[in-house]
Amino acid sequence: LSDAAPVAPHLYILADDLIWATRLAGQGRTLGAAVVTLNGISDLQALVARGPLSAQDLIAIDTTARGFEPEAAVRAAASAGRTLALAQHDDPSLRAALLEAGALRVMPYRALFERGHAILAELLGLPLPAVGSLEAPSGSGGTTK
């Protein structure tokens, strides 16, 4: 048996909106993910060029961003790994296009606000912290502060 600690999944975030990027990053860190904020489409392209991500890693893309075309960004991200698209709840045609482009899931911002920790925990394969806890569960079952 190995004593090596399990490697935390990565949560890569591509978002122009600082509030949503910060919220996603905070939720990912609370869960124990290794959070990486991508600074624009060029960072996403560099990530994709490195090759496939691990099976637990997740790329979250804010599709309301103005600096890139959302469907193309989701298509590029999905070629490297699992992709979560964040979109407005009232745009069913965009939702369908993002799923067609390869998004694993298209989540409205309201769901991120209301159930973001639970959704990200499920997608990243991480345990959900106890309600009111400031501790993130570690991969070994203990907690880290």
Spans of model-derived segments:
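Conserved phosphotransfer microenvironments
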Residues: I59-A76
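A short, hydrophobic beta-strand element within the central beta-sheet of small alpha/beta folds
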Residues: G81-D90
